[in-house]
Amino acid sequence: MAAILPRPRSLDASALYSRINARLLPFLLICYLFAYLDRVNVGFAKLQMQTDLGFSDAAYGVGAGIFFIGYVLFELPSNLLLPKIGARKTFGRILVLWGITSACMLFVRSVPAFYAMRFLLGVFEAGFAPGMIFYLSRWYGPSRMARAIAMVFLAGPIGGIVGGPVSAAIMSTLAGKAGLAGWQWMFLVEGLPCIVLGIATFLYLPDRPADAAWLSDDEKRQIEADVGAPEAHATSFRSVLRDRKVYVLAFAYFCIIASIYAISFWLPAILKAQGVSSLITLGWYTSIPYVAAAVGMLYMGRRSDRLGERRFHCAVPAAAAALLFALCAATGNHLAPTLALLTLVTMALWMAYTVFWAIPPEYIKGPAAAGGIALINTIGLSGGFWGPAAIGWIKTAAGSLQPALLAMAGVSLVGALLIFSVRLASAKH
């Protein structure tokens, strides 16, 4: 067992982590921002694409969610290879391939083609989010992890803030140019930057602190001391597969993700049904919930780190989201209360999401961390298929969104109860 190196007392830890934050977090945030945009811009494309191609609500909901089937199937292989291949090559490969696939969405003309392209997008993006968690766990100890996660995954709300107005502007101003519809231009313009980011990742990102030329040897030792020796509570991937608490976490995450992506994919359509007809106005309205989510994420991540508590900081927002979903279903077709409640729902869910991802790296240590985190994400992220698809199915069957919103209230409540039920310490298998 390798010894934990003593922390160099002369170093200013605050200054060191300020440098690490400045070097890594903005770049990772930008990468995840485009990942999020390429996942959910299909929700905005729906406003034109569904009419142009004649897709039903159910078919569109399945197509939006089928991304996650591809993601789930290839999640574990991608992350089990991550420690061997390295973050730089893994993230670079993911970015380039999903950028190409996202841009090629402009060629979709039928439901089967729509399903196929969304599936491939999931295959090529597989492993990115849990890979980020594993990568951050090599740089940040428990006392800083939730804030680092909040800073990177702030890309989700930022994507919601800028995604609506930017997508609306592209679809409105470029429609008809070069014979392409507005939704085709949107996929092209938002997909190509990922290819550039993938190349930049190969050149810029260090795989781990030991590979960072901009850190001194003392600084590298301090990071290792802060993170802790991975062998101290090492877990094998086989033991992770037998751990009941890992599956409780995974299904709790399933509920959070199903709720988040149900809102992400259907928010533009929900607001349009309330009478918002202008694409530009709709784009700005859809950004409002994500402004609140960004503030909530930063607040909850900082508070959770400061108090050293995860379970209640994750479960309470999820329970609040359940109540808010139910209230939203009761508002009927009224724009102002619907938008206000969906804003609070979005904020609560992203707060739960942020703190949730500080939990697995504290529980699963050592060589199995990448695979264990991927297992949780694999099971949980399948909620990204079922959430949007369920909204589409229920809306088609009931002729109304209200029963679908009540269903999501139930899903969020189950997630909160699962988080409440599990007590975790570092795994020692």
Model feature map: region roles:
Residues 73-112:
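Conserved MFS/SLC helix-loop-helix module at the cytosolic interface between two early adjacent transmembrane helices
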Residues 83-95, 305-318:
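Cytoplasmic membrane-interface "Motif A"-like loop-to-helix N-cap segments
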Residues 42-43, 240-298, 353, 357, ...:
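Extracytoplasmic gate region of multi-pass secondary transporters
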Residues 54, 86, 107-113, 124, ...:
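Helix-breaking motifs and short loop linkers at transmembrane-helix boundaries and internal kinks
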Residues 310-359:
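C-terminal transmembrane helical hairpin of 12-TM major facilitator-type secondary transporters
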Residues 117-154:
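Cytoplasmic helix-loop-helix junction between adjacent transmembrane helices
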Residues 147-171, 193-194, 377-387:
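Glycine-rich segments within core transmembrane alpha-helices of 12-TM secondary carriers
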Residues 74-86, 296-309, 395:
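Helix-to-loop junctions at the C-terminal end of transmembrane segments
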